[in-house]
Amino acid sequence: MIEEIRSLVDEKVNELDGVVGLRQTDQGVAPYLFQKGDDITKLVLEPRYPMAQVTSQLQKRFREADFGVVARGCDTRALFEMTKRLQIYPDKLFIIGISCTAEQAEICYCADPVPNIEDWPRSEVLGDPVPGAQPNPLVFEHENLSWDERWKFWQQQFVKCIKCYGCRDICPVCFCEACALEDPMWVEPGLLAPDFPTFHLIQAMHMTTRRIACRQ
């Protein structure tokens, strides 16, 4: 499938101002704006990366530009959520949707590995659709716990937190310029591990209406 995707990207860079995708370099893999004349063979699909964030930043900086983006199902869900919040301009974005394989869906426990972008102004989906994976068995185990057992479970999980902000930084639908998790009124600076459950509930409640099942 990678060659089919590269072929479409190669076509679109001649029509658009650029296509956002992942590029392989000697230093590793990172998001990149492929443009006319670039080596499209450097385009790769792994590892997963929150492409909606990168796309939003590009669109804000170059408001009149017409971009494309290579996006998985979770990326497209993020793009829709960002659009609702005026962080993505759909009229200036062509989506190249990628259907994940069954193996990829199982790794992420993804229930919807196929991009659902029929309502997007301009898009094309590549790859064979596969059924969604079963939920993580831990979900069923957690549902059978009492409230006290659930509280104890989360205490044990969050005591591992070192306040690295990785949960925030990897979130595909985080776009706030001022983060509540860095506000000393709510989160004491320098305190490790951060207060339970204040730090973690702020993050959870702040994102609760934007969840896209990214499994990050």
Where are the language model's segments positioned?
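Ferredoxin-type iron-sulfur electron-transfer modules in oxidoreductases and energy-metabolism complexes
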Residues: 138-158, 176-216
